[in-house]
Amino acid sequence: MQDAITSVINAADVQGKYLDDSSVEKLRGYFQTGELRVRAAATIAANAATIIKESVAKSLLYSDITRPGGNMYTTRRYAACIRDLDYYLRYATYGMLAGDPSILEERVLNGLKETYNSLGVPIGATIQAILAMKEVTISLVGPDAGKEMGLYFDYICSGLG
């Protein structure tokens, strides 16, 4: 896992150079949004169960996926879906705090699509639930933090798509 600071410094170090204006500007932006990201993370942590519940209600609960024969029909499958959504929310929050999506690649997306395909998990429905989670989260954290947080939900969706 990297963060915005490490990414900028490593890029300069690999080239054996000092930070250029663009690198300094990236760091400045990261630090200027620090309080916003921390407040958003606290709001998400305090409302995680509600975010998941509303996301499921918006995207999955009344679809064919939860009816008999659907991929979320049994209690065990439903619980696994809720667990996965919580996992995506938590790691998207970590990525937002770090200002870098590498944790999503390392801990969420690496092999996930293949695993879901082998288990018959419908990726389209998963993406729909993540997009609903993005919408619910943005409504809680506000437009500025929501824009930042949305990047990480979109990253997960892109990795699954």
From Swiss-Prot:
The keyword Metal-binding does not apply. Its main location: plastid. It is a peripheral membrane protein. One of its GO terms (cellular component) is phycobilisome. It comes from the Eukaryota. Keywords: Antenna complex, Bile pigment, Chloroplast, Chromophore, Electron transport, Membrane, Methylation, Photosynthesis, Phycobilisome, Plastid, Thylakoid, Transport. Contains one covalently linked phycocyanobilin chromophore. Light-harvesting photosynthetic bile pigment-protein from the phycobiliprotein complex. Allophycocyanin has a maximum absorption at approximately 650 nanometers. Heterodimer of an alpha and a beta chain. Belongs to the phycobiliprotein family. This is Allophycocyanin beta chain. It comes from Pyropia haitanensis. The gene is apcB.
